[in-house]
Design a protein with these regions (language model features):
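Sec-dependent N-terminal signal peptides
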Residues: 4-13
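Low-complexity, acidic/polar, glycine-enriched regions of mature
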Residues: 17-187
């Protein structure tokens, strides 16, 4: 009788644990966290980093379920141009109203609305991305490792910048082909 009772209690205990939410919020380390960006143009590309201002993920039983990241657009950098003068010229151009209009919109935001686990550490993520005050839904695959109060996330996001009103030298406005900057930006 006691063995049967123990087994029943064990099943109830396991079932109870499995259905009880265990939601945890883990803050991003803004000193180590950044967004890598890459934009392509005819004959080449530019790339760089942008720092996070703040951010966190939400997990339930160690699985990603949500999150929010504030991106500090004032910290945008360039990596590919070696001349400091020309690198800074590009950064200033990216900050002006042709691109991210950083004076008006100093931050961008990514809010994870849904994260579906597709393999051990990979998730299909649906999120709202706000750039220049315009919000659009995006989908991407991300590799997320959660260990206690630490996490590491990597993923490739490709967006059509024109959906966020970044149309400088875009193909949709009839730019001459040799001056064209691709509409897609990679993060």
């Amino acid at each position: 009788m006691s063995k049967k009772l123990f087994f029943v209690l064990l099943i109830v205990s396991i079932t109870s644990y499995a259905t009880k939410p265990h939601v945890t919020s883990v803050k991003a380390d803004t000193e180590k966290s950044y967004v890598y960006w890459r934009g392509n143009e005819v004959g080449g590309f530019h790339d760089g980093n942008i720092k996070l201002k703040s951010g966190y993920i939400i997990s339930d039983h160690g699985k990603l379920v949500g999150g929010k990241f504030i991106i500090d657009m004032n910290t945008i950098t360039n990596l590919d141009i070696k001349s400091e003068k020309y690198s800074q010229k590009l950064v200033n151009h990216l900050k002006d109203d042709h691109f991210f209009d950083v004076d008006k919109f100093p931050t961008s935001m990514l809010i994870i609305k849904n994260a579906k686990k597709i393999s051990d550490q990979n998730y299909n993520i649906t999120a709202d991305l706000t750039v220049r005050g315009i919000t659009n839904e995006i989908n991407f695959i991300s590799n997320v490792r959660i260990r206690g109060n630490q996490f590491q996330a990597e993923g490739d996001i490709v967006i059509d910048r024109t959906k966020w009103d970044v149309k400088y030298r875009s193909s949709i406005i009839g730019t001459v082909a040799d001056k064209l900057i691709e509409d897609n930006i990679e993060f």
